[in-house]
From Swiss-Prot:
Binds 1 Ca(2+) ion per subunit. The conversion to 3-oxoalanine (also known as C-formylglycine, FGly), of a serine or cysteine residue in prokaryotes and of a cysteine residue in eukaryotes, is critical for catalytic activity. Belongs to the sulfatase family. Exhibits arylsulfatase activity towards the artificial substrate 4-methylumbelliferyl sulfate. Residues 1-22 form the signal peptide. This is Arylsulfatase F. Its cofactor is Ca(2+). Ca(2+) binds at residues 38-39, 78, 345-346. The keyword RNA-binding does not apply. The active site is at residues 78, 139.
Length: 590
């Protein structure tokens, strides 16, 4: 029996080593917190050069991590940019584009949305054992065939938990001084309808049974009264406030319409609660701000506190919310094993104004803004990555990177695999972030406006430092030389409101980041060579585009029967926020 003891001992050692190894692999997978702000300009943050806007928490995040200064969004509007972020693919590949002027999900009554065959970063991480949560703005669609099918709900894209706004802020969402009065009136009106309905049923049953003698005309008149009452109520509530400005927890609508000024604070509390619930396991939290999109709902604590009006107030409130999330990460002991990423979905909205008040963001030295497919101001966004011990603090990276890079990056750090049946346009950022390589893996980036290619960026691998950018199409500014499209509020992608360039306008962003002076064969010896190189790359890229249905074209038309409703249609106003408890459990779905 004695010879067996070493074997038993060795077996125990091996078992312990395997256990430790498995535990070590688990520990190597970081928690992931992705923070995306809505419509934030790259020039709005202190860490990107703004010395009049107070953003201390985001600035601290930048000091503690890596700051990307040429971080590029795949689109200059919300829905397509976010689809590219989630999938690591240009929106043209998934069909999250339009050949017309409606380039985002228009409302919650359209069947358009991110196709279900797309693989999101949440789905990828879920396969790696992550608990996945989305808190905040979605804007990737909701329903397909009925107001309750929720085919485009975040749960169908890999998220286990959802609390937030399935649409996006619009001007109707805030302020809403009559909200509480209408909620009370609707409650009384619905009670009246129920009483009349009970009376109709009672009289009908009584007449058919011979218990009461009432004319059918009276019964039909009461039925007609209910229908007319419902129609009158529905007709008086056609504003997006009632049908699009709502909050959901899981599948349930909790506020319709929502109190926009308190929504952000509730979402931060939800985020902190999510972090606490999952502090002992590996998780993904995608916190998608409603800030700083117009109409800029801001709490009283921050109203009037900045040097930049309501927009500045909203930015500084957003920064304080980022601080609360970062503090919670520290408080729950998650700091050292949590990768935090911060960005904006696209550039600031230059044309967002109320009188002389600027309600949109500042894009610094970069030309253009939100809605412009090629100009730098619409697509160059903040990019900050912090992962203590893995990513060096205080590092600055000027290489071109993309929001599409986040999916392959989280796949890399989690041990996941990228889908092999489709083109993934993003690249793993970790070698660049950790300093293992000098250059971005991107050689070309393609800049679309809807379904139209507007510009191409070329980053040669010759250590010249040049970043060439060729514009095939540029918007016509209104008024001329204004730098924006103030007549239409957003610039167009095609037709008479754009200028087509042949040969394309050429800039070297390393020398002219503001894209102020186009290069010519007379001023740039490499002009013709660069134009030809870019044209060849564009041709190769276009050959990889597989035709799909454009979600934001024909499907982006409203259907009344798809309008979400928290009650019995059309009596849909409700406030259940205080009544609904937070779902808990292994998958958090409700």
């Amino acid at each position: 029996m004695r010879p067996r003891r070493p074997l038993v001992f060795m077996s125990l050692v091996c078992a312990l080593l395997n256990t430790c190894q498995a535990h070590r692999v688990h520990d190597d997978k970081p928690n992931i917190v992705l923070i995306m702000v809505d419509d934030l300009g790259i020039g709005d943050l202190g860490c990107y050069g703004n010395d009049t806007m107070r953003t201390p928490h985001i600035d601290r995040l930048a000091r503690e991590g890596v700051r990307l200064t040429q971080h590029i969004s795949a689109a200059s509007l919300c829905s397509p940019s976010r689809s590219a972020f989630l999938t690591g693919r240009y929106p043209i590949r998934s069909g999250m584009v339009s050949s017309g002027n409606r380039r985002v999900i228009q409302n919650l009554a359209v069947p358009a949305g991110l196709p279900l065959n797309e693989t999101t970063l949440a789905a990828l991480l879920k396969k790696q054992g992550y608990s996945t949560g989305l808190i905040g703005k979605w804007h990737q669609g909701l329903n397909c065939d009925s107001r309750s099918d929720q085919c485009h709900h975040p749960y169908n894209y890999g998220f286990d938990y959802y609390y937030g706004m399935p649409f996006t802020l619009v001007d109707s969402c805030w302020p809403d001084p009559s909200r509480n009065t209408e909620l009370a009136f609707e409650s009384q009106l619905w009670l009246c309808v129920q009483l009349v309905a009970i009376a109709i049923l009672t009289l009908t049953f009584g007449k058919l049974s011979g218990w009461v003698s009432v004319p059918w005309l009276l019964i039909f008149s009461m039925i007609l009264f209910i229908f007319l009452l419902g129609y009158a109520w529905f007709s008086s509530h056609t504003s997006p406030l009632y049908w699009d400005c709502l909050l959901m927890r899981g599948h349930e609508i909790t506020e319709q319409p929502m109190k926009a000024e308190r929504a952000g604070s509730i979402m931060v509390k939800e985020a902190i609660s999510f972090l606490e619930r999952h502090s002992k396991e590996t998780f993904l939290l995608f916190f998608s701000f409603l800030h700083v999109h117009t109409p800029l709902p801001t709490t009283d604590d921050f109203t009037g506190t900045s040097k930049h009006g309501l927009y500045g107030d909203n930015v500084e409130e957003m920064d304080s919310m980022v601080g609360k999330i970062l503090d919670a990460i520290d408080d729950f002991g998650l700091r050292n094993n949590t990768l935090v990423y911060f960005t904006s979905d696209h550039g600031g909205h230059l044309e967002a104004r109320r009188g002389h008040a600027q309600l949109g963001g500042w894009n610094g030295i970069y030309k253009g803004g939100k809605g412009m497919g090629g100009w730098e101001g619409g697509i160059r966004v903040p990019g900050i990555v912090r992962w203590p011990g893995k990513v060096p603090a205080g590092r600055l990276i000027k290489e071109p990177t993309s929001l599409m890079d986040i999916l392959p990056t989280v796949a890399s750090v989690s041990g996941g695999s990228l889908p092999q049946d489709r083109v993934i346009d993003g690249r793993d950022l970790m070698p660049l972030l950790q300093g293992n390589v000098r250059h971005s893996e991107h050689e070309f980036l393609f800049h679309y406006c809807g379904s139209y290619l507007h510009a191409v960026r070329w980053i040669p691998k010759d250590d010249s430092g040049s970043v060439w950018k060729a514009h095939y199409v540029t918007p016509v500014f209104q008024p001329p030389a204004s730098g924006g499209c103030y007549v239409t509020s957003l610039c167009r992608c095609f037709g008479e409101q754009v200028t087509y360039h042949n040969p394309p306008l050429l800039f070297d962003l390393s020398r002219d980041p503001s894209e102020s002076t186009p290069l010519t064969p007379a001023t740039e010896p490499l002009h013709d060579f660069v134009i030809k190189k870019v044209a060849n790359a564009l041709k190769e890229h276009q050959e990889t585009i597989v035709p799909v249905t454009y979600q934001l074209s024909e499907l982006n038309q409203g259907r009344t029967w798809l309008k979400p409703c928290c009650g019995v249609f059309p009596f849909c106003l409700c406030d259940k926020e205080e009544e609904v408890s937070q779902p808990r459990g292994p998958n958090e779905k409700r």
